Amino acid sequence: MATDYQDITIAFAGICQAATLVQQFANKGVADRAVFSSTIKSLLVTQPQSTLAVYDGNIAHLTMGLATVQAQMGGGNGKLDTEIGRYWINILALSQKLNKDPVAKSQLIQRLKQIERQLSLYDNDIMADQIIANLAAIYSEIISPLGSKIQVLGLQDYLVRPDIQHKVRASLLAGVRAGILWQQVGGSRWQFLFSRKKIFNQAKLFYKDFELSSD
């Protein structure tokens, strides 16, 4: 079966977007609310009709991730952000471990179903502080124990704040979800060695399509 680099790039952009959000929350204490919202919403899309449907069928919801993909795959004028690189590599590793652990996968599905039920208590606002805290708890209790803990670097003033910790962990959870998607559509670590240009070019094409549609 031919490798579908469109789907692989969409899923990888989801991973990179989560990694970028982690970096922004840890260093600035804030991130784009719309980007964070669309990233978190992807956690509750369990039966998508397409890969892009995980992000509400709109490539605009992945522009931050697509920009990061281009930088990570060779479009950053030689200035590779190794911190973001470390995040997405670790997110991928956790998603691969999750995929091989049926007990953890079952627990994750059940906990996300609980989140869906809880939404009605918060006017269906997935950005409600308690919902983000609950998603963070899922990451801490189910995902984090699967592998080495991801060391998040940033400003101590932000890193010690519970609300920032929750947003970071919720972002990591969404990244792991994108990592599962990446595996489902044929993503492979070998592609980062032998197909970097294909991934870069596809991300660039998606980004141009977004720019043209927003003009």
Curated annotation (Swiss-Prot):
Membrane topology label:
Peripheral membrane protein
First-listed, main subcellular location of the protein, grouped into a coarse class = cytoplasm
- Which Pfam families does the record match to this protein? DUF489
Q: Which GO terms describe its cellular component?
A: cytoplasm; plasma membrane
Supply the InterPro entries for this chain.
HflD (IPR007451), HflD-like_sf (IPR035932)
Subcellular location(s): the record lists: Cytoplasm; Cell inner membrane
Protein name (record): High frequency lysogenization protein HflD homolog
Cite the Gene3D superfamilies for this sequence.
Answer: HflD-like
Which cysteines does the record link by disulfide bonds? none
Protein family according to the UniProt entry: Belongs to the HflD family.
- What keywords would UniProt list here? Cell inner membrane, Cell membrane, Cytoplasm, Membrane
Superkingdom of origin: Bacteria
Family matches, as HAMAP family:
HflD_protein
